């Protein structure tokens, strides 16, 4: 038999086909099974790797950007920026990012390590202010290009073409309910659309912070769940495929993320904790007995070591005695 080389050409070929795993030890009282889609297993450790590559490739194919000449400029809560910085480094793009000052220190360090230029914004200016700041940078940057993750159709499209089919394949078509947080809306929209085309009875549940319930018609507000709850209804969120909006408090998201580490061995971020908390609520409903819930875990926990998620553990680790 002829040997086949499986070495990838570059980091972009590592994106996708992330594993799924059942939750086993945090499911007391659940009557449905929960399987987590582990997007922290992407090469740059978050679901945003998919859209970073898809938006860059789409712009390249349309002749809008050129490696070695163009500069990518984007407002980000962190993970999309990290994805863009990773892909930019691999493909020869300068990357300039606008990020809220409330995002974790780890994100800043990672972005700088990847060569991105970083501009921090005051949380009070919100997404609208970040977009204005991004446009101002664009006006002064020759060859600049804004991928516009909140509006770019390449965002939900990559989830429709990859994430959705992966979930359908790996669950052998047995998925009944999808649970996903909403940042840009791309994951829920792309995956939800694909799954509903395979089985119209599949339900799509999206997650938002109770402290900023904009999708439910409430007012935006500060919250602890980095990566979701942007304070707007994103253009890329197709509400026609959404069956339910589930609100999760920041503290609940944090506690659930801690439990996932302690009981499942899954070190995940706060938005993954929020998604898991929502999935657990759905899994305890009597009408969902015997069903399979797939929940998307967007990122791992290492990017949150300086946040409230690890406050008590960090203090303990910093004060361990030397024996």
UniProtKB/Swiss-Prot annotation:
Primary localization: cytoplasm
Q: Which GO terms describe its cellular component?
A: cytosol; plastid
Instruction: Report TM segments.
Output: none
Name which cysteines form disulfide bonds: none
Q: Which GO BP terms apply?
A: cysteine biosynthetic process from serine
A UniProt-annotated Pfam family: PALP
Q: What happens when the gene is disrupted?
A: No visible phenotype.
Q: Which InterPro entries match?
A: Cys_synth (IPR005856), Cys_Synth/Cystath_Beta-Synth (IPR050214), CysK (IPR005859), P-phosphate_BS (IPR001216), TrpB-like_PALP (IPR001926), TrpB-like_PALP_sf (IPR036052)
The pathway noted for it is:
Amino-acid biosynthesis; L-cysteine biosynthesis; L-cysteine from L-serine: step 2/2
Task: Give the record's keywords alphabetically.
Answer: Amino-acid biosynthesis, Cysteine biosynthesis, Cytoplasm, Lyase, Pyridoxal phosphate, Transferase
* Residues annotated to bind pyridoxal 5'-phosphate: 79, 183-187, 271
Tree of life domain: Eukaryota
Q: Kindly list the GO molecular function terms attached to this UniProt entry.
A: cysteine synthase activity; L-3-cyanoalanine synthase activity
Modified positions (N6-(pyridoxal phosphate)lysine) are 48
Q: In which tissues is it expressed?
A: Predominantly expressed in leaves and flowers.
Keyword check for Amino-acid biosynthesis: yes
Any keyword Lyase? yes
Could you say which protein family the record assigns here? Belongs to the cysteine synthase/cystathionine beta-synthase family.
Please describe what this protein does: Acts as a cysteine synthase. The cysteine synthesis reaction is more efficient than the cyanoalanine synthase activity.
Protein name per the record: Bifunctional L-3-cyanoalanine synthase/cysteine synthase D2
List the lineage, top down: Eukaryota, Viridiplantae, Streptophyta, Embryophyta, Tracheophyta
